[in-house]
Regions:
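Hydrophobic, membrane-interfacing alpha helices
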Residues: 1-171
Length: 171
C-alpha cells in the first residue's frame, strides 16, 4: 500500500513492504505452528527467539544486498556537488564514483563519473555490525534484545539514510 502511494504503481512489491508484512505476520504464524503442529508433535517455538533469528538473518541479508546495489549502481547516495559543510568535507575522501552506462546511477540520473556519498557501503557496514551484535546477544541468551537491536538499527538507519540518497524511487 505504501509503495503504491509513493511509487504511483498499481501493482508493485518492495523489500520494505515484505519486511513490514513479515514482522506483522510472523509472530502469528509462529503461534499458529505452536498451536497446531507444536501440540501434535509436542514442541514449542518461542516467538521472541524465532523473531530474533528472522531479524538477524534479515539484517545480514540487507547488508549483503547493499553490495549488490553497489555493483548495479542503484540505491546510490547524493553527489558531493549537492552536499555542503561537514557532509561534503567528510565524503571528499570517502566516496564512490560509478562508471558505465548500464549502472542505474548513469541511466536514471546521469550521474556517472560523479563523486557520490557511498551510502551502499555505509549501510552494508552498519547492518553487518548490527547483525554481528545481534548474533552475539542471541548466543548469550538475549534473544529479545537481539530482536530489538537489529530491528531498531535497520529501520532507523533506513529512515536516516534517505537524507543521504539521491535515487528517486517514485513515478
Amino acid at each position: 500500500i505504501v509503495a503504491r502511494i509513493v511509487e504511483k504503481k498499481k501493482a508493485t512489491l518492495t523489500i520494505g513492504g515484505a519486511v513490514f508484512a513479515g514482522v506483522v505476520t510472523a509472530p502469528w504464524i509462529i503461534m499458529l505452528v505452536n498451536a497446531t503442529l507444536g501440540t501434535a508433535f509436542n514442541f514449542h517455538l518461542p516467538v521472541a527467539v524465532m523473531m530474533a533469528c528472522l531479524s538477524i538473518g534479515y539484517t545480514f541479508g540487507e547488508s549483503l544486498g547493499r553490495l549488490a546495489c553497489l555493483s548495479f549502481g542503484c540505491c546510490y547516495g547524493k553527489p558531493l556537488s549537492q552536499c555542503t559543510g561537514h557532509a561534503r568535507k567528510l565524503f571528499e575522501h570517502f566516496n564512490v564514483v560509478f562508471t558505465g552506462e548500464t549502472k542505474k546511477v548513469a541511466y536514471a540520473s546521469g550521474l556517472a563519473g560523479e563523486k557520490m556519498i557511498p551510502i551502499q557501503i555505509i549501510t552494508a557496514v552498519i547492518y553487518a555490525i548490527s547483525g554481528l551484535v545481534g548474533t552475539l546477544l542471541f548466543l548469550r541468551g538475549f534473544a529479545g534484545i537481539a530482536l530489538v537491536e537489529t530491528l531498531v538499527v535497520t529501520q532507523v538507519w533506513r529512515v536516516v539514510s534517505e537524507f543521504f540518497r539521491a535515487d528517486f524511487r517514485g513515478e
